[in-house]
A protein has these predicted regions:
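Long, compositionally biased charged/polar accessory segments in the mid-to-C-terminal portions
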Residues: 405-406, 415-559
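SAM cofactor-binding core of SAM-dependent methyltransferases
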Residues: 51-106
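Class I S-adenosylmethionine
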Residues: 1-51, 59-65, 170-184
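Conserved acidic E/D residue at the C-terminus of a beta-strand in Rossmann-like folds
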Residues: 76-82, 225, 242-245
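Acidic, Ser/Thr-rich peripheral helices and adjacent loops at domain boundaries
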Residues: 97-99, 242-246, 255-260, 283-284, ...
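Acidic/Gly/His-enriched mid-domain segments of enzyme catalytic cores or analogous surface patches
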Residues: 85-164, 232-328, 332-334, 521-559
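Glycine-rich phosphate/pyrophosphate-binding loops
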Residues: 227-228, 235-245, 331-355
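Polyanion-binding loop/helix "lid" in catalytic or ligand-binding cores
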Residues: 320-324, 371-428
């Protein structure tokens, strides 16, 4: 703000100048900044866009003009100078209430969390030229980041559309197993002062197996499901195997195993997996973010907020989209003194996709012949990816792709934010900034055995801690079961009765995931009431049919 000067324009309104090297740049008109702002707003034509992105705040005159002209639009203002924004907050508080003002990528994420992405219809960009001219690279970078984050939110929404019904189905079927299952919350804070190891299925995992075997009594070893077969084939036991995948193919990670591990499964995980493993822990995925007012907000997996009203808290784990990222948050919650990444190549080290010994290799072996071996199959897969070269831990470069590089960015960002050291022991894999590269053997040799071993802590919790309480949940589900039958019976004939049933909070919670696409379509189109009623009836009947099929499998548990 030291380079900015506020003066009075000829119209009597405040105006703003930027002084640099003896040169004065006018941020607003020296004659009438209000009229100037109206002209700027007139140049903006968002068409169908629902969000207007503005580069440059100034004193906010153009923001007021925009909001007056487009009152239903969301406005996000990118501003480089935090002190200027604070001055506007003090002198023009009404401007601050009209838009979200962001200075960095983290604040972009916070601003987007307050927007219902389901109503998103595109963005329009308005560049406040005087502000932009001061820091063009900053505004270009921030605009690109904002668009990237919006794309990510849309991708999340599409994922939800694709998998939400499956998630709800799996949650309900897994609820049958909850009364014999430990909530992950019981492990939080129980491993203080102990290192935590995340074992992933990258190609370099095979090089760390000897050291990993020596770490069993010294560190909490959490293995992602993809890597478990590799460890078992080398007689290495992790303390916990973690799975998140809702799809049935995830059972391939466990077919043919001789030792059933302690399974930590997200409640959306495939019931085929959770039924296969006797000793298990359930967790739920949730996302925490800071709202513009500074409060912490929580966004949970569909249905789980409602479920936990009856079962009590199961325990949240935040995820960056992969099992390894969830394991990272688990170790933080467990209280580990450091986090060690093993097999986290985030690259095609040695031009391989996974470590040898995963189910992927098992699937490919029958397809090999003297003309096509595993190396050829790996190469064919890699060629289909959008690849790039990144620095490797061995001093050279290594091939990665767009998705793996996104995960690398996640680990780099997370390692920077946590207060404990993060070690990358992955030889040959991608360099992960904000972590320290150390061979696993060197770490294991330095560690001392704790007084109480990781396995002893887990054994105690499994034998002494209460499992998840489900009696109240199944009493409620039994009541809903009758309402679903009623819904199916009246949906086609009695519109008023149909809407009354759907207005019930419990029914809405269960039916909405199965009606989401229809509700989204209705929200985005200007339909007459008759058409809306017809769509709602069809969607409600389909939801009732699907839920009743699920409830039939829960029949014995219903009270």
């Amino acid at each position: 703000m030291e380079n900015f000067t506020i003066t009075i324009a000829k119209s009597g309104h405040k105006t703003l100048h930027y002084n640099i090297g003896g040169t004065t740049i006018r941020i607003h008109s020296a004659y009438d900044p209000i009229k100037e702002a109206l002209r700027i707003a007139d140049q903006c034509n968002p068409k169908r866009a629902s969000i207007i992105i503005v580069c440059g705040l100034g004193l906010g005159y153009h923001i007021q003009a925009l909001k007056s002209k487009f009152p239903t639009h969301t406005i996000i203002v990118i501003e480089k100078d935090k002190m200027l924004a604070e001055r506007v907050r003090q002198e023009f508080p009404e401007v601050i209430s009209l838009a979200s003002i962001v200075h960095d990528e983290e604040q972009i994420a916070t601003a987007l969390e307050t927007i219902d992405i389901r109503s998103f219809k595109g963005t329009a960009l308005l560049v406040h030229r005087p502000s932009y001219s001061l820091h063009p690279e900053f505004y270009d970078t921030m605009t690109a980041s904002l668009h990237k984050q919006i794309s990510s939110r849309i991708s999340d929404l599409l994922t939800r559309f694709e998998f939400e019904e499956l998630w709800v189905k799996n949650i309900l079927l897994n609820s049958k197993l909850m009364h014999t299952t430990l909530p992950v919350q019981s492990l939080f804070g129980k491993f203080k002062g102990m290192p935590g190891i995340i074992v992933s299925a990258g190609p370099s995992l095979i090089q760390s197996l000897d050291a990993l075997a020596q770490a069993y009594d010294k560190a909490l070893i959490v293995c992602v499901d993809t890597a478990y077969k590799v460890l078992e084939r080398h007689n290495i036991k992790p303390h916990i195997v973690m799975t998140l995948d809702a799809q049935t193919h995830s059972i391939k990670h466990f077919l043919g195993i001789t030792h059933k591990p302690l399974l930590l499964a997200d409640v959306v995980s495939s019931p085929k997996v959770t039924r296969l493993i006797k000793n298990k822990i359930f967790s739920t995925t949730a996302k925490y973010y800071t709202a513009p007012d500074g409060s912490i907000k929580r966004e949970s997996t569909p249905l789980m907020e409602w479920i936990q009203n009856f079962t009590g808290q199961i325990g949240d784990i935040q995820s960056g989209g992969s099992v390894a990222t969830s394991a990272f948050d688990l170790l933080l919650n467990a209280g580990c003194s450091s986090i060690v990444l093993v097999g986290q190549d985030l690259a095609y080290t040695g031009r391989e996709i996974h470590s040898r010994g995963t189910h992927h290799n098992d699937d490919w072996l029958p397809a090999t012949n003297r003309f096509k071996n595993l190396d050829t199959i790996n190469q064919n897969v890699i060629r289909k990816r959008k690849i790039k070269y990144v620095p490797s831990n061995n001093g050279s470069t290594v091939i990665t792709d767009f998705v793996l590089d996104l995960y690398r960015s996640w680990f780099e960002d997370s390692a920077k934010k946590v207060s404990i050291p993060v070690y990358n022991t992955t030889q040959g894999g991608a360099v992960i900034a904000n972590t320290t590269f150390v061979p696993l053997q060197a770490l294991v040799e330095k560690w001392k055995k704790p007084t109480v071993s990781p396995q002893e802590i887990l054994s105690y919790e499994l034998s002494h801690h209460n499992t998840i309480h489900t009696q109240s949940l199944f009493r409620k589900l039994s009541s809903i079961h009758h309402k679903l039958k009623e819904l199916q019976a009246v949906a086609a004939q009695d519109t008023a009765h149909l809407y009354a049933l759907l207005d019930d909070e419990d029914m809405d919670t269960l039916c909405s995931p199965f009606m989401r696409k229809t509700l989204f379509y209705i929200a985005r189109h200007n339909l007459d009431q008759q058409k809306i009623d017809a769509l709602i009836k069809d969607a409600a009947q389909a939801a009732a049919r699907q839920l009743l099929k699920i409830f039939a499998k829960l029949e014995e548990s219903l009270i």
